[in-house]
Amino acid sequence: MPRAYQRVTDKIFEKLDLEDQLFDRVFYEEVRWWESRFNDCTWNDCKFRRTSFSNGTQFFRCRFEKCRFWAQHTYLGGPTLFEDCEFIECSFVNIQLWNTEFVRCTFSGLFHNLIFYGPEAPEGLETVLRNVDFFGVRMELTDFRTGIDLSTTRMPEADNWIESSIWET
């Protein structure tokens, strides 16, 4: 039987500067990270529910493995930068990616009910993708809209697109 999750609830973490940290089996709920920086950190089997990374939070060379991000009011942006990060067998369900930038990131797992907005979206909604690899993702009800630039993005095979689309503007 796996060990229980450590719970962290209703917290605001500001201006953290962490390097080479391991977070294992943590359930974050109603948690906010603001103006924080993470270098070479790993989250293993963590859950993120109604959480946000925002106000300039940055991730460099971080690894998220078997993590789950879900629920309304779960935000990965506002603004947030992920650079050279790996999301391995992670699930993203009903979350917001507003004002988020992914640079040289790799994903595998599940996207369900996500919208990626391009530069023609209202201010603050754009997601920027630069050299991103979504090849290992199963996309369910996932849309790419408002002129998002996918020219450097590796997309999954057609059989991993379930009711998902790239909208032309």
Residue spans for each PLM region:
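Tandem repeat scaffolds
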Residues: 1-167
